[in-house]
Amino acid sequence: MTWRAAASTCAALLILLWALTTEGDLKVEMMAGGTQITPLNDNVTIFCNIFYSQPLNITSMGITWFWKSLTFDKEVKVFEFFGDHQEAFRPGAIVSPWRLKSGDASLRLPGIQLEEAGEYRCEVVVTPLKAQGTVQLEVVASPASRLLLDQVGMKENEDKYMCESSGFYPEAINITWEKQTQKFPHPIEISEDVITGPTIKNMDGTFNVTSCLKLNSSQEDPGTVYQCVVRHASLHTPLRSNFTLTAARHSLSETEKTDNFSIHWWPISFIGVGLVLLIVLIPWKKICNKSSSAYTPLKCILKHWNSFDTQTLKKEHLIFFCTRAWPSYQLQDGEAWPPEGSVNINTIQQLDVFCRQEGKWSEVPYVQAFFALRDNPDLCQCCRIDPALLTVTSGKSIDDNSTKSEKQTPREHSDAVPDAPILPVSPIWEPPPATTSTTPVLSSQPPTLLLPLQ
């Protein structure tokens, strides 16, 4: 009896030891480092590997995937698999049964979106054991970059180059300008005359930003290579867009300026006297009322900001769009956006169409503000906006047979972009007909699109 009791006790201990050993053999491993990064709209596979001391029988095990967003501290079930039952709570979510047999419980999610970033938890049950692991998923979007040359309103020998980066996420981005000369072939960062605007959020959650570089070509060496360098979390290497400065535009010497002045000073003097007499003949009261009360469309909107539906808009964004971004856009029907704003219905409509076609959805609400101003005659009268501007439907004359400027779509940049020439672009607007408006006349020089060579 004693021998049999001892044998039974030994067998029980062996069974208990085997059970304890088995429970410790189930383990789940996720992505190394605890963070997985994936591009926007990609078909992502979130890794989850099962390690078990025994061969896996998928008919007697279960897999459940959970997701917790970055903004809400609540888990949501994404996918579950138990025996012959599987259900996807997120469209397209799947765990391959065939791979599960070899211990691969990875979750596949097609077309991942920005809002799906967060913590994912893989829970594995092999009765009576359970193991789990978590991973942080980050969704990023790479910026698309292009260069524009904007000469509107610039002085002689001055150029403004705009580097637009769009469609990136997360918001943090770094844009710098560099130059390389024949004397100094290594890139030198430029810190002066560089203005980078605010980041603008698009409707899809991505961001846009524009950085401007102002150059005085007469003070720079021809052949100097300039680069707009974009650094972002989604890029393995910086995104570079290049252009080469050509020969500086002709600048008169002091002798030439003196000679030209001596030749033409008599006509200029007569013109000056005529202007003075004209000003004297105009009633002083009319000049006073006109100059003291008239507002440009942009200033009118800013002054009466609360009269518009601007709860989600910002004044500094409107100023940046109206004075810097919109004047560089190539609009159809020969229209160009003036930096002081416009109540010309055709100009506003063409700007609205351009922003929608180019996917600049964050700018559309700001365009609507000028529609609202035009549709408010009392406010236009209060700001003393010229009524003639409200009746103008196009900036072109009836006899203008010039062809419409074709919209140019920039080619997509690679990480390293070679030198890009400045391509000529046909004029995108003509001076408006003469009116009594006090609106300043803009330069007819259009912005030039810089396309990097592939």
From Swiss-Prot:
Residues 291-429 are annotated as: Retroviral-Gag-like. Residues 143-244 form the Ig-like C1-type domain. One of its GO terms (biological process) is NK T cell activation. Pfam families: C1-set (PF07654). Residues 59-62, 127-130 are annotated as: Interaction with NCR3. Residues 27-138 form the Ig-like V-type domain. Residues 435-454 have a biased composition (Low complexity). Not detected in any normal tissue tested. Expressed at the surface of several tumor cell lines including T and B-lymphomas, myeloid leukemias, melanomas, carcinomas and large T SV40 antigen-transformed cells (at protein level). SUPFAM superfamilies: Immunoglobulin (SSF48726), Retroviral matrix proteins (SSF47836). The C-terminal part is similar to retroviral Gag protein. This putative protein seems to be the result of a fusion between an Ig-like domain-containing protein and a ERV. PANTHER family: GAG_P30 DOMAIN-CONTAINING PROTEIN. Monomer. Interacts specifically with NCR3, but not with other natural killer cell-activating receptors, including NCR1, NCR2 and KLRK1. This is Natural cytotoxicity triggering receptor 3 ligand 1.
